């Protein structure tokens, strides 16, 4: 029997965290190529460190996207995040770009004669998850850990009062108590944030961030028993890539469900949508969210698996965690019929061949609002009625 009374913790990191700066730059490169050629292929990794950005990887795309363009886009991304410090400044960083052509051996596995982009770009397993704990059908701990940091970043960028004294680099962690399987309160809050004013101590920083944290969390979830840890190490002035080197793809649990669901191991950022690490994980979330939105379960985990060069998934697995109203084996068949789970089918259904990825690089790929231009299309619940009618 699953436990119904327990504590569960998830963490998030801000857009200024070194690894997230790297994710942002990698996805900015992806967007640049997809904007020029929707069928572009990319696998882009970024290293960020003191006064330096290194971009490397494989590309199949138009020559119209130049390294000079990518350098300018990189500087714009770093500027948007907010880095103007001596050890990492959008204007002064050295930007080195090492991109080369995609391997012909990989390309032949993905291409099929007369049918471009037919096979999966790699083997792997991908998971999707949804739960009715929040309006976005996300687990509460990761949803609110993201919201805290997003709200603080918005306030910092808008220069709202003392929030302007905060820096781009931050981390949050939220511990939620569950009773009868439902989230009821926050027992621990951890927030570490860079601050530009060296005179600030932990108490000063808490005075700045506490109103935003309280507003981000559901009313009544924070009480006298909630324990706060705000900048517990004290001073946090040197932050971002100047404090720690960053790499693309190192925050895969932050990017997904905060540890509340399994993870297949593949990162998202820097990859075009022929890479099933990304597109199939989005499809699995889309299916899981629609299962919960349809009222077929309160929680749903979906696994997909693929082989390189093979169009159809090798398997699908559904776990409703004892909360379902339908047979899981039958639901697996219904889901296979409801959505073409080939890489091409996923890209077509979710309209993934668009420059929509830089925005996903911080505050979670899931639990976001769908955008009018196709961003976060996998968060739509337009499949719910179809799934419901199948039963």
Curated annotation (Swiss-Prot):
EC main group:
transferase
Q: Which cofactor does it need?
A: Mg(2+); K(+)
Residue sites binding ATP per the record = 17, 169-171, 235-236, 244, 250-251, 267, 271
Annotated binding of L-methionine, by residue: 58, 102, 244, 275
- Segments of this protein annotated with the region Flexible loop: 102-112
The protein's annotated pathway: Amino-acid biosynthesis; S-adenosyl-L-methionine biosynthesis; S-adenosyl-L-methionine from L-methionine: step 1/1
A GO cellular component annotation here is: cytoplasm
Q: Look up the EC number in the record and give it.
A: 2.5.1.6
Provide any one GO MF term from the record. ATP binding
Highest taxon listed in the record's lineage: Bacteria
Binding site residues for K(+): 45
Where do the annotations place Mg(2+) binding?
19
Where is the segment annotated Disordered?
1-20
Q: How does it assemble?
A: Homotetramer; dimer of dimers.
Q: What is this protein called?
A: S-adenosylmethionine synthase
Q: Which organism is it from?
A: Methylorubrum populi (strain ATCC BAA-705 / NCIMB 13946 / BJ001)
